[in-house]
Amino acid sequence: MEILVNQRYFMSFASTSISPIDGRYSNQTESLKPIFSEFGLIKHRVKVEILWLIALSNDSDIRELPKFSNQNLKHLNHLILEFSEKDAKAIKQIERKTNHDVKAVEYWLRNQLKLKKMNKANEFIHFSLTSEDVNNLAYAVMLKEGLSSIVIPSIKKIRSLLK
């Protein structure tokens, strides 16, 4: 019985973390979570898919997808800017059925467009993209955002303290 008690004692947050980053340094890395967590990755995948869809709609050679109205663009931008934990959880629910993370984003986005009667655009979600395309771009945007909004300002602050 004492062994079980000791095992439970050692199963604390820090000892069940994947690395020291989310364990003993979790307080120092808290600001990175919205960008580099799984939530952040899902959010950035959504952003990549939407920006690609907007780019396709702006291409006059793709006549099957009309240019988005201001109202539709506003809705798409809202999906990016107001992406929430609830949205990420909905995508994770879809992923449980599809067993495919990027496909789950695609299905979630299709549903969001269907709700706004943007059915023509539905056919062009993920058009000519691979999952690797979406992931590579999402990770690149995450790195850029993390560097510009957290890492570089932190380095500048430390540098000014050392002067």
Predicted regions located by residue number:
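N-terminal amphipathic/basic-hydrophobic helices that include classical n-h-c signal peptides
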Residues: 1-10
